[in-house]
């Protein structure tokens, strides 16, 4: 990565602050914070009480690992306010162009325009779907945010007053802008409040952000935070608003003057307001060591939006959510593997439907309910286009409530949410060897890493606990990853025995004898999936897709048939 950024994060580490204590503002990896960069929370500490209880058990439902109770289902609308300053205004020639651009960028549907540009000797391409597209796709259509574009509104003072190197007066900016909106009837902000709390109010401010190396230190650093409406005499207070969760992002990419910023920063910050913590090392008291740790001992790196993945394609096409992130926000369940056998795994971008044989993410539990393994399938397409490779991604979760709520999930070893790389290299910049199967060459020849076991390197391990299975024979056929799960315990429940499954061909149809609920997968000779059936009877007839040679797989049995 050729640049570094720091973005402050709204997280419940503040929930535990007591009156008068210094509360560190969180930021994205790669940028050293100024000394003494703290805010003092003056409110009654009770207001920072966790907004929900936290799940810790194996029976935790999807959504139980989120750190707040912000609504995350349905078609929801949020205010997006365009803010400029007397001495720094938007680069657009007229209001119509400005409003149209942000309407498309935040509310568009399938934006596919590609714009190439040169920046510091490199060629980049802006192919930016909308923010609404991003969250619709990550949630499989369960959550579709839309934004009411408001503005532009000109602040009362120059940009340096609000930035001043440490964003000293951004709270004042938020309250000032909200007051202006209410006073001038530009929008009904109180209509966005839930029990006095606006869950998400977004500011896009004119110009670039302080987050880019070499930027003006008086500009605002993109971040998310909470503003408390304390004064009873204000228009905002009288409208019934008591707290505002806000995020802010800049208009311009780096120091280009005219190239718009991507959506990666916004999606990262917005995800905090939805309930996700950061998955990089947030140890700002020892920033240089944290940077070194990210480089040499990264947790999720470019594979997660909440780590370095928001920078993919310079932020113009941020990485899609991981299976655990989708699970945390209630958009995906994790199928538990309880018996050994053969399994297929569809792309994480595919909407799961186990009844139809579409499996998007698997979970391997351990003896500790908060420690488990997740298996997902990545391809270099869509939001995952700028991933380092294709194949099975194996991640380990070691849930720690304090770490999640306090936003120090991966500050210490062992990491509490991390990828288990196929090449056993945990460095952030070596992500091309992270997925299974992994092929490499050395002086002895070509080798393929197609297994991950409880006794191998890396260990199939979450925290201090091991699952009861190891994984072998990982292969990728088209967009499908297949693998075998073998029990490490002789008493473990096994999959149907080979002799319990039979596959035969007669009159152009397959006859499959297998336990009810078995998955029958049919591939063409190149390995491309053709059909998938979940059996509803012990003996079931299944038509072949057409003439030719087909590969049929059910449980531990694979047959080649010709029609």
Regions found by a protein language model. Name each.
Residues 21-22, 494, 547-563:
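C-terminal tail/sorting-segment detector
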Residues 519, 529-546:
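Glycine-centered tight-turn motifs at strand-turn-strand junctions
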């Amino acid at each position: 990565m050729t640049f570094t950024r720091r973005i402050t994060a709204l997280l419940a580490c503040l929930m535990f602050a007591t009156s008068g204590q210094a509360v560190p503002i969180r930021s994205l990896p790669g940028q050293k914070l100024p000394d003494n960069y703290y805010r003092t929370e003056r409110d009654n500490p009770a207001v920072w009480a966790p907004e929900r209880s936290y799940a810790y058990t194996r029976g935790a439902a999807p959504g139980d690992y989120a750190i707040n109770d912000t609504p995350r289902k349905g078609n929801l609308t949020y205010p997006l306010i365009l803010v400029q300053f007397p001495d720094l205004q938007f680069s657009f020639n007229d209001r119509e162009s400005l409003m149209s651009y942000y309407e498309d960028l935040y509310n568009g549907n399938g934006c596919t325009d590609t714009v190439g540009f040169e920046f510091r000797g490199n060629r980049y391409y802006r192919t930016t779907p909308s923010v609404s597209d991003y969250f619709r796709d990550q949630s499989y259509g369960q959550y579709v945010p839309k934004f009411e574009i408001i503005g532009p509104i000109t602040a009362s003072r120059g940009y340096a007053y609000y930035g001043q190197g440490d964003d000293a007066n951004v709270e004042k900016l938020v309250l000032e802008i909200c007051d202006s909106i209410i006073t001038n009837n530009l929008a009904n902000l109180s209509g966005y409040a839930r029990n006095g709390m606006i869950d998400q109010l977004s500011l896009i401010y004119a110009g670039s952000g302080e987050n880019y190396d070499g930027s003006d230190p008086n500009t605002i650093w993109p971040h998310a935070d909470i503003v408390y409406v304390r004064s009873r005499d204000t228009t905002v207070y009288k409208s019934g608003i008591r707290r505002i969760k806000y995020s802010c992002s800049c208009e311009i990419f780096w120091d280009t003057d005219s190239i718009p910023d991507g959506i990666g920063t916004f999606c990262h910050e917005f995800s905090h307001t939805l309930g996700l913590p950061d998955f990089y090392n947030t140890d700002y008291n020892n920033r240089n060591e944290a940077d070194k740790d990210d480089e040499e001992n990264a947790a999720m790196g470019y594979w997660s939006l909440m780590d370095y993945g928001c920078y993919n394609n310079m932020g113009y096409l941020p990485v899609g959510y991981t299976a655990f992130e989708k699970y945390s926000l209630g958009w995906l369940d994790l199928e538990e593997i309880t018996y050994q056998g053969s399994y297929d795994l569809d792309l994480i971008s595919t909407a799961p439907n186990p009844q139809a044989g579409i499996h998007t993410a698997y979970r391997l539990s351990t003896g500790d309910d908060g420690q488990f393994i997740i298996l997902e399938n990545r391809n270099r397409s869509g939001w995952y286009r700028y991933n380092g490779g294709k194949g099975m991604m194996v991640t380990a979760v070691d849930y720690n409530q304090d770490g999640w709520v306090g936003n120090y999930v991966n500050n210490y070893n062992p990491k509490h949410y991390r990828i288990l790389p196929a090449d056993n290299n945990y460095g952030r910049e070596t992500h091309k060897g992270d997925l299974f199967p992994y092929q490499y060459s050395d002086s002895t020849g070509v080798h393929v890493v197609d297994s991950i076991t409880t006794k191998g390197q890396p260990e199939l391990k979450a925290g201090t606990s091991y699952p009861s299975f190891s994984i072998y024979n990982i292969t990728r056929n088209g967009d499908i990853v297949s693998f075998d799960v073998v029990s490490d315990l002789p008493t473990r429940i096994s999959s149907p025995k080979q002799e319990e499954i039979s596959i035969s061909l007669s009159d152009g149809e397959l006859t499959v004898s297998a336990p009810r609920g078995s998955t029958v997968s049919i591939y063409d000779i190149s390995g491309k999936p053709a059909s998938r059936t979940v059996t509803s009877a012990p003996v079931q007839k299944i038509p072949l897709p057409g003439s030719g040679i087909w590969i049929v797989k059910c449980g531990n049995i694979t047959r080649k048939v010709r029609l």
